[in-house]
Amino acid sequence: MPKSPTPIPAPPVKIQRGAPSRAPAKKRRRKKKRNPFLWFLQGLVRRIYFGLKTGFKFLLLVPVLVFMVAFSYNVDRSGLFQGALAPRRIVDLMLQGYDVTNFEQMDERQVVQLYAQDVPETPEAIGIGSSRVLQFNRENTGVESFFNMGVTGADVRDNMTSYYKMVTYGKAPKVLLWSLDPWVFYGSEAAFDARADADLYNEFLTKVLNVPTDYEEPNQVELWKALADPAYFQGNVDYYFKNRGQATVTDDEGNTIEFNPVEGDPYNQPTTIKRSDGSVLYDVAFRSQTEDQIRTLAAEACMSFNSVHMEGFDEMSQTQIQAFDSFIKYAQSQGTTVILVLSPWHPYLYGYLLTEPEMHKGFFQVEN
């Protein structure tokens, strides 16, 4: 068969459409295992970094907070920490060596407590008692650093807590001059003065004499929160700038505080004044009375003598005697020498009381 010059075409190749072409299989890489120690270190470093960053921001606020707290504590317009503004004014003046006016309007008990808090150096001797002890001063005691902590109408609670406050501030004196009043040994509620700090006395009984009372430690948390309160800080700022450099000082409500330095001769004042040593100097008119005028006052006092903390005082209380003895031992344990003073009453008064001794048995027991 002769060959055909035309080549025979090859059969067509079937192309399958839609069938995915397979890529050559790749080998899967194994994940490297994390070193747990390195992972821990990375987390720790991250936490430290962010912690330091936050702490640094907080540190920038610390000086501001410290200033706010210190300023509010020292100005303390509401008397939360430093005491009420009026007694603070009195104590500030006395510590600067000034005698102070307007004695009749003073809260004497607050003044005594704030003095114990603020006096920079411990006085060598202090006096406690009621009005009669208030005549002791630096001149007649011969003690330059003497301070009189007596208060008008002082009862046994006033006497003991005045000394106790000095001890709590680490200022126990070398000598305690105690002018004893008869009602110190009277075991009735009638012997108490309404102005005395009953809570402070219960604290003293509980903590020092171990006598059970209803005393509970006050919760100071809410009180101290006020120091960081922006509103209290702002109020203190306003009060400070309002009163800075002013001759007339006001209280938190804007009322004038009427306690000022005595001007002129202290022995020539028309009103009773508080001396810088805590003693009281009565006005010229009171000190200039004649003998007859004084006897008249003594006669008038006879009629109401028992009403002065001694109503029904028939005998000395054994409980009060024990409390008195415990207090003396407590003071001695603080290194304090106790000197007891029995200030005399007017002779006319003694003569009157002796006409009815059955009504004043407790009084005469103390006097004898």
Predicted regions located by residue number:
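Secreted/periplasmic serine-hydrolase-like ester/acetyl group-modifying domain
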Residues: 194-337
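Short alpha-helical segments and helix-capping/turn motifs at coil-helix boundaries
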Residues: 108-114, 159-166, 323-324
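Membrane-embedded segments
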Residues: 121-214
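Second-shell loop/turn segments in exported
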Residues: 148-153, 310-317, 327, 354-357
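N-terminal secretory targeting modules
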Residues: 2-121
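Soluble non-cytosolic domains of exported or imported proteins
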Residues: 153-157, 171, 288, 314-322, ...
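Substrate-gating cap/lid alpha-helix
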Residues: 348-368
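Short, conserved beta-strand edge motifs with alternating hydrophobic and charged residues
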Residues: 339-343
